[in-house]
Amino acid sequence: MFAATRLSRLRHDTSRILSHWILPLGWLALLTGMFWVGDRSDYHRLFYILLAAPTLLYVILQPRLLRPLTGSPLFIAFLAFSSYMMLSLSWSTPENSTGSLLKRPLYIALLFFCAAILALEAPLRLKTATWLAALGAVISAAATLLRYYWDANPLRLTGYGALYNPLLSAHVYGAFTALWLAYWMQSRPILAPLPLISLALLGGLLIATGSRTPLVGLTAALMWLVLAGDRKKALIALALALAGALLGYILYPEVITQRGASFRPEIWADALRQISEHPWLGHGYDHPMRIVLSNGMLLADPHNIELGVLFAGGIIGLLLWVAIYALAFGFSWKNRKSPAVLLASTWLVFGLAAGLTEGNAFLPRPKEHWFLIWIPMALLYALWIQQRFAASRRGEDIAAP
């Protein structure tokens, strides 16, 4: 009896250390690691050590949580999509090992579970860690801009360390720009200094990258905020964004004039041609795509995440993919008055729109594409789980005599 009590106490204390200390640290490391980790492989190790392994241990210690965590409609939709993609390996010729590919949905599932555990056990720490990550992105952006202008800078800001090219920097910093847009929308004074300074620094960095992908995403995020948030502030932000775009065009006209459509119509046309060869089931997950442009350039992706899903999984895969987003946005619209939901959904809108003009990796290991898809999706999933638990407890209170 005494031994059982001690074991129960040990399990409780270990779970608390995980949920209140290690997992918040892991969440913060995931969101900020690309700013200070010099190598992408080290970023993966950070995820495995500080987030994936502790989350798995927590679920083992608290198995009662597994049923509600896996019973969410959003998680079931993700499970259906990822299972289908893993099944498609049977007719694919993947470029990576099957074992490596099979682990990727598990990593995303552990990300979901981590966010949900934090939302249930330490919601304030989840909120604080996310805010600290957003602040860290601003500090990193300021340091990156200083270094860029201090050095004999090239035409485009490429980034440093794990963010070694303009697109990677644009994806990650663009995601945090969308986050600060939502923070500004939720601040009481319209001229709240911290959000505005943050937006100015992040916006300046995005312009310096020369990438137009985040501009597409931020425009969509602003439109979402017009619909779901404070309409007056969102319209003001839209006007400021247009003014910023005009200023950017004056300072960096080559961003628009020199690169045109960057071969996107030609890329998408050839991607659709290849998709038409296997329209229903697709070519299979991780099947190589080769697109040869008219100038002889060889590309390995369609520069559109949804086309990547359609190429790999066909129409069936795309429908399962759309189901994930439909559930996420249905929940977001229904709960748009919640500041946390508005924050996460704005981030998700940014990622969805940005992915329409760049990218292909929809089930990757932890990297920049997670900032477009799976991190904001995990936040919405966590808030959904949190809401279901709160409703369940209210029902128990009402039923109690």
From Swiss-Prot:
Keywords: Cell inner membrane, Cell membrane, Glycosyltransferase, Lipopolysaccharide biosynthesis, Membrane, Transferase, Transmembrane, Transmembrane helix. Coiled coil: none annotated. Changing residue 264 to A: No effect on activity. Can complement a knockout mutant. InterPro entries: O-antigen_ligase-rel_domated, WaaL-like. It is found in: Cell inner membrane. Its EC number is 2.4.99.26. Residues 258-319 are annotated as: WZY-C. It comes from the Bacteria. Residues 38-42, 93-103, 151-161, 209-212, 253-306, 358-368 are periplasmic. Residues 1-20, 62-72, 123-129, 184-189, 230-234, 332-339, 386-401 are cytoplasmic. Activity does not require ATP and magnesium ions. It is a multi-pass membrane protein. GO terms for molecular function: glycosyltransferase activity; ligase activity; O-antigen ligase activity. The chain crosses the membrane at residues 21-37, 43-61, 73-92, 104-122, 130-150, 162-183, 190-208, 213-229, 235-252, 307-331, 340-357, 369-385. PANTHER family: LIPOPOLYSACCHARIDE BIOSYNTHESIS PROTEIN PA4999-RELATED (PTHR37422:SF13), TEICHURONIC ACID BIOSYNTHESIS PROTEIN TUAE (PTHR37422). Belongs to the O-antigen ligase family. Was originally reported to have ATPase activity, required for ligation as an energy source. However, it was shown later that ligation occurs without ATP and magnesium ions, and that WaaL cannot catalyze ATP hydrolysis in vitro. This is O-antigen ligase. It comes from Pseudomonas aeruginosa (strain ATCC 15692 / DSM 22644 / CIP 104116 / JCM 14847 / LMG 12228 / 1C / PRS 101 / PAO1). The lineage of its organism: Bacteria, Pseudomonadati, Pseudomonadota, Gammaproteobacteria, Pseudomonadales. The gene is waaL.
